[in-house]
A protein has these predicted regions:
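Transmembrane beta-strands of outer-membrane beta-barrel pores
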Residues: 40-48, 81-89, 123-129, 163-169, ...
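Outer-membrane beta-barrel translocator/channel fold
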Residues: 81-101, 195-282, 286-297
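Surface-exposed extracellular loop regions of Gram-negative outer-membrane beta-barrel proteins
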Residues: 147-150, 160-164, 171-176
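Bacterial Sec-dependent N-terminal signal peptides
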Residues: 1-40, 305
């Protein structure tokens, strides 16, 4: 499979590194690729007119491979960013817009004979309005960091676990994160998640160079930082999406992934940004959001160099 790319939001190979099988060091819910990538995705849900757009960019700025390494490990510096804009029909007492922005600097390198480690630092912005003017330092801007250790079981499987550091509550907090990835021949499977942003997983098969198909499960979480009754709060929205994701390759660099499925459950809750209550209860007296299953459709474009 030289110079091929197999997607379910997963694998990439670049021309100069045909012997490097892959790099699945997951930071938050984004993979790190060995080649530059730009992707755009639009999500449409059947109820409440929910519409979401997402733009992601990742650019490796320095990349080295290890000669004769049995686990195809690499050393890489990369910069990345992600933008999510979400909007639905207005509901009294609940945010109907959400803007999540992030930017990170990442470094991955081998450790010992069969390990790698990943570090990252960056910023995250979580606002209840899709306007850049709604960004306010001290209100909805937080610092992010990560440290993950990755065990390369063999050439087909790797497992990673570590911590995310986030100033969600106004001071550094540590949250767990983990992933597992497997690839053998045309088959691939992966799962990843963390406390703050939920999780995703997929099982897929590449039928031919221009076509692959995955079964995708997505329980991602989106956040909006705001004031509720004069107190600092965060509004979380979580989906439970299951669907089929066909991916069509057009030419050398372009991929068109689709997802057709159902949002089995969508809920939204307020949490006060205070340690004593954040993990145990919702914001007292605040409304909650809950919807029955709805159709889900997503279309995207990926450009990989």
């Amino acid at each position: 499979m030289k110079n091929t790319i197999f997607y379910c939001n997963t694998l990439s190979k670049s021309k100069g590194f045909d012997k490097v099988h892959k790099l699945f060091a997951w930071l938050y819910l984004l993979p790190i690729f060995v080649s530059a990538q730009v992707s755009f995705k639009t999500d449409i849900l059947g109820k409440e007119g929910l519409f979401r757009e997402e733009l992601s960019l990742q650019l490796p700025i320095h990349l080295d491979s290890l000669a004769k390494d049995p686990y195809k490990r690499i050393s890489v510096w990369a910069v990345g960013g992600n933008m999510v804009f979400q909007q639905m029909n207005p509901t009294e007492g609940l945010p109907y817009q959400t803007m999540n922005l992030s930017a990170n600097i990442l470094h991955l390198r081998p450790l010992g004979t069969r390990w790698s480690w990943l570090t990252a630092v960056g910023l995250g912005i979580y606002t209840p309005e899709n306007r850049l003017s709604s960004i306010a330092i001290g209100e909805n801007v937080v610092a992010n960091g990560a440290l993950l250790f990755i065990w390369h079981s063999n050439q087909h499987m790797q497992i990673g676990a570590g911590i995310l550091v986030n100033t969600l509550l106004g001071y550094p907090m540590v949250f767990p994160t983990a992933f597992v990835e497997y690839q053998a021949g045309q088959w691939i499977g992966w799962a990843k998640g963390n406390f703050l942003e939920g999780g995703k997983g997929a099982i897929g098969y590449r039928f031919s160079e221009p076509f692959s198909l995955c079964l995708l499960a997505d329980a991602s979480i989106y956040a909006a930082f705001l004031r509720k009754e004069g107190k600092k709060a965060v509004f979380f929205t979580q989906h439970t999406i299951v669907g089929l994701q066909p991916d069509f390759r057009v030419g050398k660099y372009l991929h068109i992934p689709l997802v057709i499925g159902a949002d089995l459950m969508r809920m939204g809750i307020y949490k006060e940004r205070k340690l004593s209550t954040f993990f145990t209860q919702t914001f007292e007296g605040a409304p909650k959001q809950s919807y029955s299953p709805a159709l889900y459709f997503s279309v995207g474009i990926k450009i990989v160099n």
